[in-house]
Amino acid sequence: MTLSTTIKTLAFASILALAPSQMMAAQKGGTFTTGDKTFLLNGKPFVVKAAELHYPRIPRAYWEHRIKMCKALGMNTICLYVFWNIHEQQEGKFDFTGNNDVAAFCRLAQKNGMYVIVRPGPYVCAEWEMGGLPWWLLKKKDIRLREQDPYFMQRVEIFEKEVGKQLAPLTIQNGGPIIMVQVENEYGSYGKDKPYVSAIRDIVRKSGFDKVSLFQCDWSSNFLNNGLDDLTWTMNFGTGANIDQQFKRLGEVRPNAPKMCSEFWSGWFDKWGARHENRPAKDMVEGMDEMLSKGISFSLYMTHGGTSFGHWAGANSPGFQPDVTSYDYDAPINEWGLATPKFYELQKMMAKYNDGKKLPAVPKAPMSIIKVPEFKFTEYKPLSYGIGKEKESNAPQSFEDMDMGWGTLVYETTVPAIENISTLTGEFHDFAQVYVNGKYVGKIDRVKNEKSLELPAMPQGAQLTIVVEGMGRINFGRAIKDYKGIIGNVTITTQKEDCELTLTPTRWNNSTIADDYQTAVKALAMPTNKMRGLQTKAGYYRGYFNIKKVGDTFINMEAFGKGQVYVNGHALGRFWQIGPQQTLYLPGCWLKKGKNEVIVLDVVGPKGEAGKLGSNVAPTAFCQDHPELDKLNLEKSNKHNEPGHRMDLNSETPVLKGEFKAGNGWQTIKLDKPVTGRYFAIQAESSQSGDRQIALAEVHLQDAQGNRIDRNNWVAFYADSEKGNSTLDKMFDLQESTYWQTEKGANFPHLGIVDMGKEVTISAFEYLPCAEQGAPGSVKAFKLYVKK
């Protein structure tokens, strides 16, 4: 070997020894900027065709497969959120390893010829626990989230600097794949605060993203509220939308700006107690075809949704609408990574926009699908065996007070003699089970907007036990400051002679039960004793199954009630017998040949014989080769059509009547004079098309000062007709892309009644028709009623 050859060999070895991020930085840098009505990649026009993927929702072993699936669709970019709360689960302790290694995910994208768009929050929404904000922020009771609260901003800056350490070396200027970085996320749907958004922009820049292109996303109805002059503005909207209408205002204020839909919603998310959501492939494909034909960039949210493993699924409001574990989203690539019919329809269209080149082949699935025969859970320990921290207090403590992020809190107090039936009232977040002297009395379910329960007569010194399980924190809107457990005091109200007595217990024992794997294993290892003698089969169950070949599968949880599942130490997510999800995705990369451990934490207890007190029958489960995402087991219908709730309006005088204009977009009609009431009713007399079906996306009411009235306490009270998941509450669910829709063939007039929770004064009515092309189902003639 010559000296020259030796030097070359050593130089090559030195390059190989560099860390991956250093190798990226060592590569030749590029540019990504905005030009005249187009983006410019290295100075040349470029249309972003992005696929939204979320690294925490995909097992790391499958990351590259999912990226290749997106490339086979014709995408050139991966778009991702950075989830603050998964990286900083405890204040000051950061984790960017394993499945949290977002830099490795970005490098895989670059390896496969894909660019990357990074959306580092701090808030991300995404149907994710608290929108990505860490729960421990709530330990500071007076914190103002997503505002210039000093503590909040301090923690945001610390987090974004950590993100910068991971990802700033991977920007395109440093030879990496990252071409754009987002500032905040859909802030217009939260508030109007340019100084706050500006401060977040400055933090992002100082974190190492000072040369990369920055942008902010919002809806066409509110993007100007917080739009910063030095950022690119992008729109978010769903399939079927009128695309020209969505970009109309942007074109007026920035005629030379490139257009981009930063979230084109391919489907929608599922909620416990409602049917599985789906959206037509035709609408998605036609919308993307139209955008590409006009040179409009996009990110398809979601291209592959994946799974909200563990306790990471969030919830929506008004009310409390927790999301299921599956984040399938009816996306082109399904939850377990396979191509759907949507995928192939989209791929066929995308091939037209690939510069005449053939799209890559669809990669083979990393695992086959397997079944596992029925197996038994032969080990059991009561729920109380998982108790960790205990605390005495004068009032019930929240999860946050007890320094617990996720799990269950057991509250115990004693009560004086109560001779008659009484009513227990409080704010229970989220699923409370009530016991008197160990005997089960009933449940209080936040999903159903329940706040009270009837209690039997109780002797002197009776023990009242309330077991409260917390589900995902609200991730969208002003209700994201979502504390868990019992919030505030609990009261017991009863009648004695001619008096109504209200008692407030002031001595409580608070006991935490974390929902992690370590707590479950510890509980199962404890010796049997008589701790907390509640008459329930809630608790920890362990079983095993043996397999000769690993593969992806779906564990069927229909034999159990409500809780969490851990397989070989991996948290699969939440299950709940009400559905619609009845199986949990179990990735084959988490299984092993031979014996596999399954632990179930069931806060309710199994169904059937296995759930009966004194029964020795072991509950069972099995794994199937397909998911069950659309099977409901509800105690009663989730439709809002109870006959007793329909108001007789024949003798009432409407406070407003008239006709809406045809077409998309918000319309506001002022009342002749302000009126006060607790209930409002919208009665549709006809539609713009002449059809009998209506679709109403959103409603706002204005107070006497012209401000929008808070809708967090609104409840759907009555609707004469509701089609599928398009129930009455959709007209105040904060989402402009969903709507209350009546069944085809249902006769006019159509009536929707909303309970606002308290009396309010109303001066104007705002109405948004369905946002889809042509505003199908738009109301024409209407009447508005307000009642006390």
Where are each of the predicted segments found?
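N-terminal carbohydrate-binding accessory modules
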Residues: 25-77, 107, 550
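Catalytic-core region of carbohydrate-active enzymes that cleave or remodel glycosidic bonds
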Residues: 207, 211, 240-334, 338, ...
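Aromatic- and acidic-residue-enriched segments that line the glycan-binding/catalytic groove
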Residues: 92-98, 111, 122-146, 197-201, ...
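Short beta-strand-plus-loop segments that form exposed binding edges in beta-rich domains
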Residues: 466-472, 600-607, 683-690, 770
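Aromatic, loop-rich ligand-recognition surfaces of beta-strand-rich domains
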Residues: 572, 642-651, 661-788
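Active-site neighborhood of glycoside hydrolase catalytic domains
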Residues: 152-227
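Aromatic-lined substrate-binding rim segments of carbohydrate-active enzymes
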Residues: 63-129, 201-206
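Aromatic-lined ligand-binding clefts that engage carbohydrates, nucleic acids, or primary amines
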Residues: 421-435, 464, 545-568, 575-576, ...
